[in-house]
Amino acid sequence: MPFYIILIINTLFTFGISATRPIVSIYSTTLGYYSFTLGILIASYSFLSMLLAARTGRWVDHLGARKMAFCGALGVFLALLLPWLIPNLFFLFLSQIIMGISQLFIVLSIQKTVGNMNGDREKLIATHSLSGAIGDMLGPLASGYIYAHFGFQVTFGVAMSAVLLGILMSFLLKSSDWKSGEPIKQSGVPLQQESVWRLLRDTNLRNAILISGVVLYSRELITAYFPLYGSNIGMTSSEIGIVLSLSASMSLVVRLLQYRLVKMIGRSRVMSGTVLLSAFTFLFVFLTDIPLLLAIIFAFMGAFLGMGQPLSMVYAMDLSPVERHGEILGLRLSINRVLQFVAPIIFGGIGGVFGIGSIFLVNSFILFISSRFIRIDPAITGPIFPRKANDGA
């Protein structure tokens, strides 16, 4: 039961965050801001988390997942409350900065807790990712409709309600339910930890983190820039929300097939193949502005990117010791946040000069390069470090 409560909480928080991210882009244009300013606004989401991701992972390792998740939950609620009270550009910036670091607290805490529970890690991570995909699917679908009919503040109010429900549900969990995400007991013996950079000498771990960063940042690119692209070609906010939800729903569907595909083809081949196929979908977005074709393309894009995200997380945990999982998962997200921070500023300039569609073309090239040169040894099929001490049920 605690496992499923954590999954529901994850869905509620993902819903609240994913419902508002595309609306921030759309609403900013109504305030008269475009291209470069929007790029900086989108990048602000990643600013603090880019600087603190690996350190946040260490905080999760040393302070425990329960405390960090609760701090993150309060932060997300505050991030939604501020622009709801005062909807102007300054509070949108402040909201995105707080949202980015708070979401990081929640994600790392839940990932470490779920990934170290008893059972098959592949299935645990797939189920966890499925709960997030449900939130990603429902969030834009609901917010697109609500924003079109009721406006900005009602949209953020609904998102806040989902987050508040998640906070209230967290009180159903006991301290022991977070056991698998709590600090490892060392029986009085100081833990001798090598530098995280020494861990990254492992080529496979390094590649898993790099692939993860590229995949996660590509998903964020969709959330941030497709609303602008859709608006430019005449799509309504409801239609944009439907396309984003369709993409997320395919991400959900493909995760139901993930375990079987990995067993049939192999985890490494599935991950490399989905990155390559994702590159083609970004290229096709650049080549068309027909809404129906875009919906189909984004459905496939959601499926391919949705497969790569949980697989890279499994690799990151399999290739690192359990007492360093928070730090490694944080480092994994720091690569994502660096790309999220730098890319919107660069892409905002590119979009201003060459059009928003060119952003998808550039990312297609990045994914092609990643699929060709960043690979993981197919021989690695399970954990190389034993689980210990805090395995939870």
Where are these predicted regions, by residue range?
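Helix-to-loop junctions at the C-terminal end of transmembrane segments
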Residues: 52-64, 147, 254-266, 351-352
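Juxtamembrane intracellular "pre-TM" segments in multi-pass secondary transporters
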Residues: 1, 175-209, 392-393
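Cytoplasmic helix-loop-helix junction between adjacent transmembrane helices
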Residues: 97-133, 315
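Helix-loop boundary and gating motifs at the non-cytosolic
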Residues: 1-46, 206-211, 215-233, 240
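Residue-level signature of mid-helix packing/kink "hotspots" within the transmembrane helices
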Residues: 46-54, 136-137, 248-256, 340-341
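C-terminal membrane-cytosol helix-exit motif in multi-pass small-molecule transporters
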Residues: 160-183, 370-378
